[in-house]
Amino acid sequence: KIPCGESCVWIPCLTSVFNCKCENKVCYHD
């Protein structure tokens, strides 16, 4: 998993357009 450099504590992952998903309050992609 690669961190997308974004947290998702209060808001969803804005980087989800790059297939990033919230996991442990941090956005990751495979």
Curated annotation (Swiss-Prot):
Disulfide bonds join 4-20, 8-22, 13-27. SUPFAM superfamilies: Cyclotides. The keyword Nucleotidyltransferase does not apply. Keywords: Antiviral protein, Disulfide bond, Knottin, Plant defense. This is a cyclic peptide. InterPro entries: Cyclotide, Cyclotide_bracelet_CS, Cyclotide_sf. There is a cross-link at residues 1-30 (Cyclopeptide (Lys-Asp)). One of its GO terms (biological process) is regulation of defense response to virus. Belongs to the cyclotide family. Bracelet subfamily. Probably participates in a plant defense mechanism. Inhibits the cytopathic effects of the human immunodeficiency virus. The presence of a 'disulfide through disulfide knot' structurally defines this protein as a knottin. This is Circulin-E. The lineage of its organism: Eukaryota, Viridiplantae, Streptophyta, Embryophyta, Tracheophyta.
